[in-house]
Structures are given as structure tokens and as C-alpha cells.
Regions:
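Flavin-dependent oxidoreductase catalytic core characteristic
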Residues: 1-134, 143-153, 157, 161, ...
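Short beta-alpha junctions and helix-cap segments that line functional grooves
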Residues: 155, 170, 180-181, 197-199, ...
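Short Gly/Pro-enriched turn/cap motifs at secondary-structure boundaries
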Residues: 173-176, 200-203, 220, 246-253
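Glycine-rich active-site loop/lid that clamps phosphate-bearing ligands
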Residues: 237-246, 251, 255-257
Length: 630
């Protein structure tokens, strides 16, 4: 069963209604896409509270000591996090790292929480995914932002003590298009009756508390819409039907979960009816920071392996690090790790200060981190050669260091899909980047807008662009010697300022050229966003290097900016010189079967099963596979 097909217009309306329409705080990322390098929003470099840092350092020391006792290879081999590891994490308060101390949690800042995830994930990435899904999108964060005091007192102490939570939105036939959500929550006396099936619920087999998104039918006294609930996993009618298995993250407890006539008390409603997607997206503004924390750990691991191996491995009379083909890979890994760490630290501290709107910045670091970590790990595997492709267990059996290079590559792959795929992140960020334009000129390109609305929008747009466009012609980045406070990195900051204005001009040209069709130019929008990510990363790297005053940091920031500028310039060129239109036309012919002969010569794909499984409402017909700690 799945909900009837939802039209493009309705899907867009649902997505638009879910986003935060207002910008109550300034945003460095928003200004960057408008051609304004607002360094005052990130400079001077934020400083974490010394007392909070001291407490966090003490905790991180304990967490490190525990992490050193974990057998990461056992988790990979058994595809299971041992009970004693879960109990140990609970004993350390790891399930309550972000929960306020008054509810029994540790109250770590975003900065130190992400450092904890980076650390524990280095023992095995499944551990980082467990804690991230639990705290960043599971019950704690939505309740922190939207929950009532009664809900916080009821649920947060349980979680802080070690109960696991999960977030359930995706369904067998519903992924990035939530307008088609099929799960329903029918109002009944005292609450709601929940029915539906949820797919890919990370922590689902372990969780005792669930955040569930479901459609509330519109009726008298009920505004309806996608709504968020806290659901007790032990409630009658909840069945964990299957634990899913994946390419990587083999310790992940990910489930298919069925709800059949599950009673959810009224007091378990989070926020208001119809507010579910807004809650999910708002939660992800800071929740997304946990994913690049895992990516940063992979970058650090890749750098450590590349450095030590390439110094020890001798080929043609020299360490392989001395050969240019390998040296360039090492330099890329080192520079990118520095850039990613700078972005993540900056975003975390901005979130902790709570003076800026970081929805664009957090999305950019998620996008950049997931893409670049994959490339860094791939280069590390290449540096290792055949040993990079060999499993850690096989290496150890031959008496060599058990380096899980191939595992890291497998574990990382999901990050380009988790919490918004790269393609969806491009569109999400692009929508926020052009918000200023749509707020003044959106009605001009809206086919359903009346003539009166279009006329008023034209007047607004004329006034806005008369002020804005002249600011894109000249800027501080064209003044020799500007940004001198950045020392040898000043030239990179001048580039960021110039490129920011160029980026804004290119975006404006595209809007003028394609108008309402711009949303379909996904290749163009993706490149615009990727350029913005590079400029944000350069700003963060230079700001960090300047603040820390470490010569090694300045060297790494310079190296990163040199590489980032090349990538940005390639994308600027590709904005208008590309094969996008040809590719779209070719893809249409491929799908129509014109080139099906290319598929000959191999065995056919399996004929059994559906591409997307169907489901029927009703009680579960399979055994519950819920995992309970012994």
C-alpha cells in the first residue's frame, strides 16, 4: 500500500511550508550567496566557554579511555555492538551528552559533542552513528527545541540514563518526497491511533522511544498534516519486523517498523498538528553537524594511515611519500582535513553562541564533509594499494597492521545519502541561497500569481535590484593589500570576496534567464552551492589559522585555499560550459530503451521482487526482532 500519487505542485507546497520562512538572525552563508562577505559574523573567531571546555576535556578523557577498550573489529565481524559496549556508553552518560544536566544529561556544547562523536567513531563508525541518530535527530533534540516541560521531564531522564531513541520518517515508498507520507495518526479519544510502516529506522531495533512522523487527517478540531509524536516502542501494536543490513556500518541497528492501531497519548504530540516536517528540518539545522563529525574522524584516520604508511613503504629506493603521484594525494588529505575541521568547529561554535542562523552553514558542512571524506578515504585506499583493498582481519592474519581501510570506505558511503542526499542538499541549500530573490520577485515568476501581485512584485524587485546590483561591481577584494590582518592568507580572503560577488552575479543571471525554470536546472544549482561551500570552507580555514597563530595551521590553510580555488574556478567555468541539456536528453533515451543493447552480454537482473516493496495495513505477520539488552 502507498498513498496515491501526489502532484509536483502539492509536493512543492508541502516542502515550502516546512522550511523556516523568516530569518530572525544574521547568516554568514546567506550573505555569502548574496555577494557579501560578512566577516563580522565569524571574526573574531568564536571561543568556547573555558569552564565548559574544562568539563568537556575531562569527559573526553574518560570517553577516550573507554574507546580504547572497544574491539572495533569484533563489531565489524559480528555485525553487532556488544551489550557491554552499550552498557559502558550508558554508564559514561554518552546517551545524554546533549541533554541539559537538570534532566540528568551532560549538557555538552555542540562543539564538544561533535568532538565526542569523532572520537568514539574512531573505535568503530557504527558507534558514532548510534549516538548521532539517537541525539541529533532522535527524541532529545526535537524535545529540546519543541517539547513541553512535561515531555522533557518525562522522557529526557530516561534517555540520559541510556535508553535509545530513533527517528522514523522514511517509508518503503517515501524518501525525499514527504508529501506522499502514508502513515496515519487518526484522532481518537485521548490521543491518536497510529498505523503505517517505516523503513530504515536507525537504532530501530534497539530504541525504546521513537520520534514518528505521520499524517493526521484534517477534520473538525484538527488542522491535520504531517505531525511528530513520541511513541513508546513497547506499546501494543509496534513490531520490529526486520533488521536491515548494508554495505557498511555493519553494527548499525536499523529496522523496518510496523505500527498497527498503536495508541499514542495526546500528551506525546510534539509541537502542533501539521508541524512535523518543520520540526524535522529545524532539528536538522544543528543535528546535521553530527554527520560531518564522523566525516572528520574519517579524514583524520585517512591522514594518519597515509602519513605513516607512505613514510614506511619504500618503492624504487624512496618512501612512496616522496613520489609526486602519492605526495599530491597526501597533501589533499591533509589540507581537506584541516578545512573540514575548521568548517565544523566554526559551525558548532556559531550554534553554541546562538547569535546566527546557521541553516545554510550546517547544510554546507554536511554536504562538503560527506563528499570530501569519501574522496579522502578513496585516496587513502589508493595510497595503500592492494593492502587498502584487503580487510583488517586478513592483514592481521598475515602479521601486518590491521588497518581497516576498505571498511572506512564502505562505512563512509552512506554519508552522501544520510540526512539528505548530496542531490537533495544541493536543492535545499540553493532554495535558501535564493530566498532573498524569491521574497521580492517570486510572484513575477509564479504562474498562479495575479496581475496585481506580479505588478507589486515588479515594483519591489526594481527597488531591491537597484540597490543590490551596483554592490556586486566593486568590493574590498579588488583593493591591493586588503584583509592584511590575515597576513599571508590575505590574498585568499580577497579571492573569497571577489568570488562571492561573482557567485551572486551568476545566480542573478540564471534567475533572469530561466526564471521559474531555474528549479529544474539542478546541475547549475549544484555547482552554485558547491562554489559557496568552497568559499565558506576557505573563510573558516583562514579565520581559524589567523586566530590560532600556529605556523603549521597557516601552511595548511594556504594549501587548502590553493586547492579550493582551483575547484571553485572549475565550477565557475562549468556553470555555462557543460553537457547538462545533452545529458538530460540522453537519459530520457536510455530510460526509453534506445540503448538497451548495451546491456547485453551479462546475466539479467533478478526477476523476483519489486523495485519498491508494497505493504498492507494490519497486524504484523512476522516475528518481532527487537533487540533487548541482556
Amino acid at each position: 500500500m502507498s498513498q496515491s500519487t501526489v502532484g509536483e505542485k502539492q509536493a512543492r507546497q508541502v516542502a515550502e511550508a516546512a522550511r523556516e520562512a523568516e530569518w530572525r538572525k544574521p547568516s554568514f552563508g546567506k550573505e555569502l550567496f548574496l555577494g557579501r562577505l560578512r566577516l563580522d559574523l565569524i571574526d573574531p573567531w568564536p571561543r568556547p566557554d573555558p569552564e565548559a571546555t574544562a568539563r568537556a576535556d575531562e569527559y573526553l578523557g574518560k570517553l577516550r579511555a573507554f574507546a580504547e577498550t572497544i574491539d572495533g573489529e569484533q563489531i565489524e565481524r559480528d555485525a553487532r555492538i556488544p551489550d557491554e559496549v552499550l552498557r559502558g556508553l550508558a554508564g559514561l552518560g554518552a546517551f545524554g551528552m546533549k541533554i541539559d544536566p537538570k534532566y540528568g544529561g551532560l549538557g555538552l556544547t555542540n562543539l564538544h559533542y561533535c568532538k565526542a562523536l569523532t572520537l568514539i567513531g574512531s573505535a568503530n563508525p557504527s558507534l558514532g552513528a548510534l549516538l548521532s541518530a539517537h541525539q541529533s535527530i532522535g527524541v532529545p533534540q526535537p524535545l529540546k527545541m519543541f517539547g513541553t516541560e512535561e515531555q522533557k521531564q518525562k522522557f529526557l531522564p530516561r534517555i540520559a540514563k541510556g535508553e535509545v531513541s530513533a527517528f522514523l520518517l522514511t517509508e518503503p515508498d517515501v524518501g525525499s518526497d514527504p508529501a506522499r507520507l502514508s502513515s496515519t495518526a487518526e484522532p481518537v479519544e485521548g490521543g491518536y491511533k497510529l498505523n503505517g510502516v517505516k523503513l530504515w529506522a536507525t537504532n530501530g531495533t534497539l530504541a525504546t522511544l521513537l520520534v514518528v512522523m505521520a499524517q493526521v487527517p484534517k477534520s473538525e478540531g484538527h488542522r491535520g498534516g504531517i505531525t511528530a509524536f513520541v511513541v513508546e516502542a513497547d506499546a501494543p501494536g509496534v513490531t520490529i519486523e526486520k533488521r536491515n543490513a548494508f554495505l557498511g556500518l555493519r553494527g548499525l541497528e536499523n529496522s523496518v517498523t510496523r505500527f498497527h492501531d498503536v495508541f499514542v497519548p495526546q500528551e506525546n504530540l510534539i509541537g502542533r498538528e501539521g508541524q512535523g516536517l518543520k520540526i524535522a528540518l529545524t532539528t536538522l539545522n544543528t543535528g546535521r553537524l553530527s554527520l560531518p563529525a564522523a566525516c572528520l574522524g574519517a579524514g583524520k584516520f585517512s591522514l594518519s594511515v597515509a602519513r605513516q604508511w607512505s613514510a614506511a613503504r619504500i618503492q624504487w629506493g624512496l618512501p612512496v611519500a616522496r613520489h609526486e603521484a602519492v605526495a599530491t594525494k597526501i597533501a589533499f588529505i591533509a589540507a581537506t582535513t584541516y578545512g573540514l575541521e575548521s568548517m565544523l568547529d566554526l559551525c558548532c561554535m556559531l550554534a553554541d553562541d546562538d547569535r546566527n542562523d546557521i541553516r545554510i552553514e550546517a547544510a554546507l558542512v554536511k554536504l562538503f564533509g560527506s563528499e570530501m571524506a569519501w574522496l579522502m578515504a578513496d585516496e587513502m585506499v589508493q595510497i595503500r594499494g592492494g593492502r587498502g583493498y584487503e580487510s583488517a582481519a586478513s592483514l592481521a592474519a598475515r602479521g601486518e597492521k590491521a588497518i581497516p581501510a576498505e571498511q572506512i570506505l564502505r562505512d563512509l558511503r552512506i554519508n552522501r545519502i544520510f540526512e539528505g542526499s548530496t542531490e537533495i542538499m544541493h536543492l535545499l541549500i540553493a532554495r535558501e541561497a535564493v530566498d532573498a530573490h524569491l521574497s521580492v520577485a517570486g510572484d513575477i515568476i509564479d504562474p498562479e500569481a495575479s496581475r496585481g501581485r506580479k505588478a507589486r512584485a515588479g515594483a519591489r524587485a526594481g527597488a531591491f535590484y537597484a540597490r543590490w546590483l551596483p554592490t556586486l561591481a566593486l568590493g574590498r577584494g579588488q583593493v591591493p593589500g586588503s584583509y592584511a590582518e590575515f597576513g599571508s592568507l590575505a590574498r585568499h580572503m580577497r579571492y573569497v570576496e571577489r568570488a562571492s560577488r561573482k557567485l551572486a552575479r551568476e545566480t542573478f543571471y540564471a534567475m533572469a534567464r530561466w526564471q521559474g525554470k531555474l528549479e529544474r536546472k539542478q546541475g547549475f544549482l549544484g555547482r552554485i552551492v558547491d562554489i559557496g561551500a568552497e568559499l565558506f570552507a576557505m573563510s573558516a580555514a583562514c579565520g581559524r589559522a589567523r586566530a590560532e597563530g600556529d605556523p603549521a595551521g597557516v601552511e595548511l590553510a594556504d594549501l587548502f585555499c590553493r586547492q579550493a580555488r582551483l575547484r571553485a574556478e572549475q565550477r565557475f567555468t562549468a556553470l555555462w560550459q557543460n553537457t547538462d541539456a545533452v545529458d538530460v536528453a540522453a537519459a530520457k533515451r536510455v530510460v526509453e530503451g534506445r540503448y538497451a543493447a548495451l546491456e547485453e552480454g551479462i546475466l539479467p537482473l533478478p526477476s523476483e521482487g519489486d523495485w519498491v516493496s508494497s505493504w498492507q495495513p494490519g497486524p504484523s505477520t512476522v516475528e518481532d526482532v527487537r533487540r533487548r539488552l541482556e
